[in-house]
Swiss-Prot record:
Protein name (database record): Progesterone receptor
Gene that encodes the chain: Pgr
Assembly and interaction partners: Interacts with SMARD1 and UNC45A. Interacts with CUEDC2; the interaction promotes ubiquitination, decreases sumoylation, and represses transcriptional activity. Interacts with PIAS3; the interaction promotes sumoylation of PR in a hormone-dependent manner, inhibits DNA-binding, and alters nuclear export. Interacts with SP1; the interaction requires ligand-induced phosphorylation on Ser-294 by ERK1/2 MAPK. Interacts with PRMT2. Isoform A interacts with NCOR2. Isoform B (but not isoform A) interacts with NCOA2 and NCOA1. Isoform B (but not isoform A) interacts with KLF9.
Region (AF1) residue spans: 453-539
Signal peptide, first to last residue: none
Organism, scientific name: Mus musculus (Mouse)
Cross-link (Glycyl lysine isopeptide (Lys-Gly) (interchain with G-Cter in ubiquitin)): K388
Length: 926
């Protein structure tokens, strides 16, 4: 490009320029139009204007994606503008054909001036112009597509519309602050979803600058500015600015950056190429700007490109949320520029601004937002706006965001889901639902999870999925206006943060059940048409409030505990069928010695109960069947449970008199044989240990070493059972822990041999030694053993039981007294508690005796006989201690195995006991 071409008056349209054919492809060529002001200013212009480099050709003002240029024309409206045009040199009123669209002032002419200043610098003499097809191909501003009108004449002139890309607001001359410079006017003729984002200096396409508002008296000049920056200005000064002829100064009220619009809506702009002004739509209106408004408060919605088609509220909200959460959205980076205050700065309060399909749902931000923190959820406006609370009455004055829309550190609250700790929600198995990452660490939600939030909300309530807890709660399923399924914050139930999480889903009353809440009503109306199968997950309040605890009332009551057949009643203390009842009676009375052909683990059920009588009898004994046991048929279980709740140990030490001892006896009809036992004795029955097996192999021949090893294994298991039983014993836990250990170590052998006597007495009527269901020794097997004399010593106990006909209640009380029958010589640490406990169980033994004896003399004699038996056990157990210690010492020689716990007890305590370092507590003197 030659110097003559650079000095062509058509390069820059100024006052007095003569028309000449334009160069196609040059973006700065003037329109093919001869304005009313034509003079001779060629020399002035040529001294300023410089050629444009070819590298920037087509990029400064790219063509819009439309057809060839449309010729411009003037209308008869210039008559009304003659006075105004005469006052402004270099400025004219541009009108479209037919007067349908009047050219509005360029909203951001300061950007154009900055671009002109930046790019109109000498870059050499070589310059060429792109052809029209080449220019058409380089269109980086076609991203808005059909959103912009294809024909500028199609826009009504009465609207006064200018594209927000090139529009700017009116600013008073005296207001030079950054906040005031960035004010925008909400258009009346265009809803916020149709607005477009205003490019700022931070944009990649606009290397813009700030504004220096100052009046200039020069007319129609294009001159170089000093480039200095006025104090208080929003950004660096613009260069090559067209100055107005009659500037009024700061007090004149005239805008410093652009000419004010005429009262009739007709505004003035500099001449320029029609190709670059065609897609522009004005946003200027006569209404004043809102004070303190954020410059992006009404333009961010345009950036996300919301379609104009009528959409469902839920779909529009989901689409908006999806666009806000996408990676392409930089969290409001476009807000950084000279037209808006920096993010994090406080915004002045402003009235609520309508927001498209969500009217009256925004309010200004209260307080300073956190620096560089963009909300993850809820607010699709800029930091200057937040979702407004729907409140009524006096509460409307207190503006606070909805708890389920807040993205801060405060905990969220949801109507149907109480608060809970913040776990990540597992991926859901519901069809059509994507996994949503919850918790403070999640930065976004996948777009798939954003669609269909209304159905998601309903399915959450129906299926009972736990809510995601974290810095935000589940999103609302509908706009706040109509049919919302969310309640305001005031109606939410307060739940403590430390409370345990309740049931998975809250009960919803349906079909005549308890009253439906607001959320349940929405669910009832919407769910059957959407997802009928999920109605099966709903349950009434009565069912949801029940805890998953199973008492004895909920267990099957008509099943035989032995074979699983239908039970006919409670026989020998156990709920059994008639077949098992007869079998047990015949097996006990006939004294049969059954042997298992297997490993004592045969299956006993309705079909195979007759295959192995040994295992069937073992199972009967394990279930607690006792020959001559009490019949508790049709007994009120509630009364028994209330009796157990009233258990209390008496505090007095003295023995009760006869009336007190016999006062607990209640007589019923003889056919029922039901007696109400004392509460403490009844509790002792409930904590009685289960049957323990020895694990002896009866298929192998009996040897002394194998039998002793099996007895040691049985003793180890019974020792553990004694520890468990003593811990459940009323009053025993009140003793010192050392005293508890000492009492168990001193009495474990007495308890084992006493239990052996009771089992032999009840199961085999004292004819054999019933060590365990899988280890029963008759007299013939005893004689073959090396410890036959020891077996005869132990056999004395069941024989005494048979002689005295000891009852179960008496046995339970005597067993506890055996635990408290031996103490150290120096006494126990909690000696007083020990004596009180022992006296209490002595009284319980007297009560147990009074259940059977009907007089003072028989009861006293019975008490003497039973206590004498307890005293005799000391000498009997001493023989067992001596034999056990000798066998333990010679265990390697005798090939007898001792378990670990039993070995420790034997090595630590048996030498003390045999040396007389313990004190036996006797009822009678020798």
């Amino acid at each position: 490009m030659t110097e003559l071409q650079a000095k062509d008056p058509q390069v820059l349209h100024t006052s007095g320029a003569s028309p000449s054919p334009p160069h196609i492809g040059s973006p700065l060529l003037a329109r093919l139009d001869s304005g009313p002001f034509q003079g001779s200013q060629h020399s002035d212009v040529s001294s300023v204007v410089s050629p444009i480099p070819i590298s920037l050709d087509g990029l400064l003002f790219p063509r819009s994606c439309r057809g060839p240029e449309l010729p411009d024309g003037k209308t008869g409206d210039q008559q009304s503008l003659s006075d105004v045009e005469g006052a402004f040199s270099g400025v004219e009123a541009t009108h479209r054909e037919g007067g349908r669209n009047s050219r509005a002032p360029e909203k951001d002419s300061r950007l154009l001036d900055s671009v002109l200043d930046s790019l109109l610098t000498p870059s050499g003499t070589e310059q060429s112009h792109a052809s029209p097809p080449a220019c058409e191909a380089i269109t980086s501003w076609c991203l808005f597509g059909p959103e912009l009108p294809e024909d500028p004449r199609s826009v009504p002139a009465t609207k006064g519309l200018l594209s927000p890309l090139m529009s700017r607001p009116e600013i008073k001359a005296g207001d030079s602050s950054g906040t005031g410079a960035g004010q925008k006017v909400l258009p009346k003729g265009l809803s916020p979803p149709r607005q477009l984002l205003l490019p700022t200096s931070g944009s990649a396409h606009w290397p813009g600058a700030g504004v220096k508002p100052s009046p200039q008296p020069a007319a129609g000049e294009v001159e170089e500015d000093s480039g200095l920056e006025t104090e208080g200005s929003a950004a660096p000064l613009l260069k090559s600015k067209p100055r107005a002829l009659e500037g009024t100064g700061s007090g004149g009220g005239v805008a410093a950056n652009a000419a004010s619009a005429a009262p009739g809506g007709v505004t003035l702009v500099p001449k320029e190429d029609s190709r670059f002004s065609a897609p522009r739509v004005s946003l200027e209106q006569d209404s004043p700007i809102a004070p303190g408004r954020s410059p992006l408060a009404t333009t961010v919605v345009d950036f996300i490109h919301v379609p104009i088609l009528p959409l469902n509220h839920a779909l529009l909200a989901a689409r908006t949320r999806q666009l806000l959460e996408g990676d392409s959205y930089d969290g409001g980076a476009t807000a950084q520029g000279p037209f808006a205050p920096p993010r994090g700065s406080p915004s002045a309060p402003s009235p609520p601004v309508p927001c498209g399909d969500f009217p009256d749902c925004t309010y200004p931000l209260e307080g300073d937002p956190k620096e560089d923190v963009f909300p993850l959820y809820g607010d699709f406006q800029t930091p200057g706006l937040k979702i407004k609370e729907e409140e009524e009455g006096a509460d409307a004055a207190v503006r606070s965001p909805r708890p389920y829309l807040s993205a801060g550190a405060s905990s969220s609250t949801f109507p149907d889901f109480p608060l809970a700790p913040a776990p990540q929600r597992a991926p859901s198995s519901r069809p059509g639902e994507a996994a949503v990452a919850g918790g403070p660490s999640s930065a976004a939600v996948s777009p798939a999870s954003s669609s269909g939030s209304a159905l998601e909300c309903i399915l959450y309530k129906a299926e009972g999925a736990p809510p995601t807890q974290g810095s935000f709660a589940p999103l609302p399923c509908k706009p706040p206006a109509a049919g919302s399924c969310l309640l305001p914050r005031d109606s939410l139930p307060a739940a403590p943060a430390t409370a345990a999480a309740p049931a998975i889903y809250q009960p919803l009353g349906l079909n005549g059940l308890p009253q439906l809440g607001y959320q349940a009503a929405v669910l009832k109306d919407s769910l059957p048409q959407v997802y009928p199968p999920y109605l099966n997950y709903l349950r009434p309040d009565s069912e949801a409030s029940q805890s998953p605890q199973y008492g004895f009332d909920s267990l099957p009551q008509k099943i035989c505990l032995i074979c699983g057949d239908e039970a006919s009643g409670c026989h020998y203390g156990v709920l059994t069928c008639g077949s098992c009842k007869v079998f047990f009676k015949r097996a006990m009375e006939g004294q049969h010695n059954y042997l298992c052909a297997g490993r004592n683990d045969c299956i006993v059920d309705k079909i195979r109960r007759k295959n192995c009588p040994a295992c069937r009898l073992r199972k009967c004994c394990q279930a607690g069947m006792v020959l001559g046991g009490r019949k508790f048929k049709k007994f009120n279980k509630v009364r028994v449970m209330r009796t157990l709740d009233g258990v209390a140990l008496p505090q007095s030490v003295g023995l009760p008199n006869e009336s007190q001892a016999l006062g607990q006896r209640i007589t019923f009809s003889p056919n029922q044989e039901i007696q109400l036992v004392p509460p403490l004795i009844n509790l002792l029955m409930s904590i009685e240990p289960d049957v323990v097996y020895a694990g002896h192999d009866n298929t192998k021949p009996d040897t002394s070493s194998s039998l002793l090893t099996s007895l040691n294994q049985l003793g180890e298991r019974q020792l553990l059972s004694v520890v468990k039983w003593s811990k459940s014993l009323p009053g025993f836990r009140n003793l010192h822990i050392d005293d508890q250990i000492t009492l168990i170590q001193y009495s474990w052998m007495s308890l084992m041999v006493f239990g052996l006597g009771w089992r032999s007495y009840k199961h085999v009527s004292g004819q054999m030694l019933y060590f365990a269901p899988d280890l029963i020794l008759n007299e013939q097997r005893m004689k073959e053993l090396s410890f036959y004399s020891l077996c005869l010593t132990m056999w004395q106990i069941p024989q005494e039981f048979v002689k005295l006909q000891v009852t179960h209640e008496e046995f339970l009380c005597m067993k506890v007294l055996l635990l408290l029958n031996t103490i150290p010589l120096e006494g126990l640490r909690s000696q007083s508690q020990f004596e009180e406990m022992r006296s209490s169980y002595i009284r319980e033994l007297i009560k147990a005796i009074g259940l059977r004896q009907k007089g003072v003399v028989p009861s006293s004699q019975r008490f003497y006989q039973l206590t004498k038996l307890l005293d005799s056990l000391h000498d009997l157990v001493k023989q067992l201690h001596l034999y056990c210690l000798n066998t333990f010492i010679q265990s390697r020689t005798l090939a007898v195995e001792f378990p670990e716990m039993m070995s420790e007890v034997i090595a630590a305590q048996l030498p003390k006991i045999l040396a007389g370092m313990v004190k036996p507590l006797l009822f009678h003197k020798k």
